[in-house]
A protein has these predicted regions:
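Conserved MFS/SLC helix-loop-helix module at the cytosolic interface between two early adjacent transmembrane helices
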Residues: 53-91
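Cytoplasmic helix-loop-helix junction between adjacent transmembrane helices
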Residues: 91, 97-135
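Helix-loop-helix hairpin linking two adjacent transmembrane segments in secondary transporters
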Residues: 131-177
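Juxtamembrane intracellular "pre-TM" segments in multi-pass secondary transporters
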Residues: 177-205
Length: 212
């Protein structure tokens, strides 16, 4: 279960674009209040920019928060802010929630790769990193399918898919204990390399920015 829990961290990393199917309905709704189509589309791409910002801030946050604390905080921020449009259909509040959603995603993304590199080596590490990449694609496909099923209930309902973040949080807390024997080593490594972003993180952030 530990491996499944670790891989589940990547299931929702590119989920900000999963709600695209709901854009027509969202545009129709917010046009009643004077919001343009471009402003509504921004709600989909905004998290991508927040992810990039968080990747730069992570080196500072790591000085006060452990890896486990960052992942838990990221999942809570991701899930809670992701569900806001489900209960509140106010553009400014949704705009803020999408921004926080991206920041939470950035906190998780920063650790989804490194946590595997720290816990596994050799073929296991290579295999797990490959599975992690697949988890992103599978997660995106599942969420997009779920959005399509929820859309007939109204566009606010599609944001319910982000409630899955709480399940991932539960799996992480229950099945991924912090490896005490690696604690000191990881802290030293963090001091040496906290200011640098891993190349996969750079590629991920740049990909989101280009798509947005």
């Amino acid at each position: 279960m530990e491996r499944i829990s670790l891989l589940s961290l990547s299931l929702m990393l590119i989920s900000s674009f999963s709600i695209t199917a709901g854009l027509p309905a969202m545009k129709a709704y917010f046009s009643q209040f004077g919001y343009s189509a471009g402003q509504v589309e921004l709600l989909v791409s905004l998290p991508a920019f927040a992810v990039v910002v968080m990747l730069f801030l992570n080196s500072l946050i790591e000085r006060w928060m452990s890896e486990r604390q960052m992942i838990v905080a990221g999942l809570l921020l991701f899930s809670t802010s992701g569900l806001v449009p489900l209960v509140v259909q106010d553009y400014p509040l949704i705009f803020l929630s999408r921004l926080l959603f991206g920041l939470g995603t950035g906190m998780i993304n920063a650790k989804a790769i490194s946590i595997i590199s720290e816990r596994y080596s050799g073929n296991d590490k290579t295999r797990m990193l490959g599975y992690r990449g697949s988890a992103e694609v599978v997660g995106s496909a599942i969420l997009t399918f779920m959005v399509g099923q929820l859309l007939p209930l109204g566009w606010p309902a599609i944001f319910a898919v982000y409630g899955g973040g709480y399940l991932i949080l539960l799996l992480y807390i229950l099945f991924v204990p912090y490896p005490k024997e690696k604690k000191q080593a990881s802290l030293k490594e963090k001091k040496k390399g906290s200011a640098r972003l891993h190349s996969p993180q750079w590629r991920f952030s740049l990909m989101l920015a280009v798509i947005a």
